[in-house]
């Protein structure tokens, strides 16, 4: 069965196994998610569960938002996302971190850190030119075909805005779950800055 939960990235730390092996982990705080809506093939054309995370202040929510969460008997939520192919949940039910177990393989989605306007070396990993001996080519993007094509091709790697993209890292392992603190420890790094929204769901390629 597919599992899914929303949380916030706290940061990174490290833990040790009983054998003394060091494991770098990312700490994700996932307070209980509330099921706001259950979508079915008959009514919506597909099966999905809509969940909400992080209570929103009453002043910041409008009447439609309050009406939407009224059936779940909960406060309006800051983040609302859908998980497909999750069964056995009803409106108002809570999804907690103990849904997952140590050893589960998951896909983690977040928004990468924004870096602003960057050049081709930082943005695309291109090599620079010689820095001396009369060279006038240092950190520029290189030839763009000004003569033969007489135009710049689409998808040419150029300088521009870097980061701030939706990124998914697949097949990460859950090292530990701490239900009393609503915390999940995931092996390795996950995309996003501290306090950013993180989506954790069962890996689609697990075992492949």
Swiss-Prot record:
GO molecular function, one term: rRNA binding
Protein name: Large ribosomal subunit protein uL3
Family that this chain belongs to: Belongs to the universal ribosomal protein uL3 family.
A Pfam family assignment: Ribosomal_L3
Lineage, highest ranks first: Bacteria, Bacillati, Bacillota, Bacilli, Lactobacillales
GO biological process, one term: translation
Region (Disordered): 123-147
Record's keyword annotation contains rRNA-binding: yes
Keywords for this protein: Ribonucleoprotein, Ribosomal protein, RNA-binding, rRNA-binding
Keyword Transcription carried by entry: no
Parts of the chain that traverse the membrane: none
GO cellular component annotations of the record: cytosolic large ribosomal subunit
Job description of the protein: One of the primary rRNA binding proteins, it binds directly near the 3'-end of the 23S rRNA, where it nucleates assembly of the 50S subunit.
Subunit structure: Part of the 50S ribosomal subunit. Forms a cluster with proteins L14 and L19.
